[in-house]
């Protein structure tokens, strides 16, 4: 119930704040003065509905998509002592974090990685790669699992879905304003919407969507520090630092995690310069230093 109320409150807040801001800056009058007959409030509501619908639909099917895209095999009956240990460890960490035990799976990948997903912290999935299980020590694997449980317990999947919904809303909204302005003012289309509207809107959505993704990734990086902190509480600070140091030693290994899951993986590769703005994870050095300061 609280998550539904949060979703509705976020939707309402986005629409109200944007509507008030546009009115204060006289945007409706500016558009009308330039011959653009556009009801901005109705457009904003339309964009909010579809913007949040897209992100929440992705959230609700995230477990299914994760299983399909990574080939994750869910452990229902452990066949080996490693699978038995994995289930017992996740059960213990979940209990300590105060959440229902998530589904546990293994996906076939050489890279050392793991992810958590799911629409609800009591209906989640935590999966680790075969490479991580084979090359990491039990303490390191436990720390990685604790990090992922931290994502689940912190409600990061829902939070990022709401952030993405806000971003989607404004990208759609401003892309359509730009499209209408170009179509009516520059190309002088009088009746309906001309081809310039559709071309400009699509182009604007691509450009604005690319730029707006930096906002989502910035927020994702902040959540990583929180998940590391949760991992340190559940598995121990030294173990969490050790796991990140081990990941740092494997940074040359290609990461093949689907883009839709990288925000909740433990390892998202390495980017430098401006590309770092579009990383879902902070540099490992920063994460290790934050844990050391934690003590």
Swiss-Prot record:
Asked whether the keyword Manganese is assigned, the reply is no
Q: Does the keyword Transport apply?
A: no
Membrane topology (UniProt): Multi-pass membrane protein
The record's GO CC annotations read: plasma membrane
List the disulfide bonds in this chain. none
Q: Which UniProt keywords apply?
A: Cell inner membrane, Cell membrane, Hydrolase, Membrane, Metal-binding, Metalloprotease, Protease, Transmembrane, Transmembrane helix, Zinc
Which prosthetic group or cofactor does it need?
Zn(2+)
Note one Pfam family from the annotation. Answer: Peptidase_M48
Concerning CDD domains, the annotation shows: M48B_HtpX_like
Q: Single GO molecular-function term?
A: metalloendopeptidase activity
Which EC class is this protein assigned? hydrolase
User: Where's the active site on this chain?
Assistant: 148
The cofactor note from the UniProt entry for this protein is: Binds 1 zinc ion per subunit.
Q: Which HAMAP family match?
A: Pept_M48_protease_HtpX
Q: Supply the name of the protein.
A: Protease HtpX
State the organism of origin. Answer: Pseudomonas syringae pv. tomato (strain ATCC BAA-871 / DC3000)
């Amino acid at each position: 119930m609280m998550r539904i109320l949060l979703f509705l409150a976020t939707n309402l807040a986005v629409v109200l704040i944007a509507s008030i801001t546009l009115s204060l800056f006289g945007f409706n009058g500016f558009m009308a003065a330039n011959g653009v007959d556009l009801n901005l409030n109705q457009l904003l509501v339309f964009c909010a509905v579809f913007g949040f619908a897209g992100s929440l639909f992705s959230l609700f099917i995230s477990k299914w998509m994760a299983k399909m895209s990574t080939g994750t095999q869910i452990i229902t009956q452990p066949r080996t002592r490693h699978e038995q240990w994995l289930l017992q460890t996740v059960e213990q960490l979940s209990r300590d974090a105060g959440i229902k035990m998530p589904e546990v799976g293994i996906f076939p990948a050489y890279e050392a990685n793991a992810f958590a997903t799911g629409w609800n912290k009591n209906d989640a999935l935590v999966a680790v790669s075969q490479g991580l299980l084979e090359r990491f020590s039990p303490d390191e694997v436990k720390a990685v699992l604790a990090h992922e449980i931290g994502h689940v317990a912190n409600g990061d999947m829902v939070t990022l879905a709401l952030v993405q919904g806000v971003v989607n809303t404004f990208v759609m909204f401003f892309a359509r304003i730009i499209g209408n302005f170009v179509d009516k003012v520059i190309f002088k289309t009088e009746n309906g919407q001309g081809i310039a509207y559709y071309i400009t809107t699509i182009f604007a959505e691509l450009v604005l969507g690319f730029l707006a993704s930096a906002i989502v990734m910035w927020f994702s990086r902040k959540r990583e520090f929180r998940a590391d902190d949760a991992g340190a509480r559940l598995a121990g600070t030294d173990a969490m630092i050790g796991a990140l140091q081990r990941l740092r030693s494997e940074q040359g290994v290609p990461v093949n995690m689907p883009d839709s899951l990288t925000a909740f993986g433990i390892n998202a590769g390495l980017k430098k310069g401006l590309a770092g703005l579009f990383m879902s994870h902070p540099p490992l050095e920063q994460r290790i230093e934050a844990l050391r300061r934690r003590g």
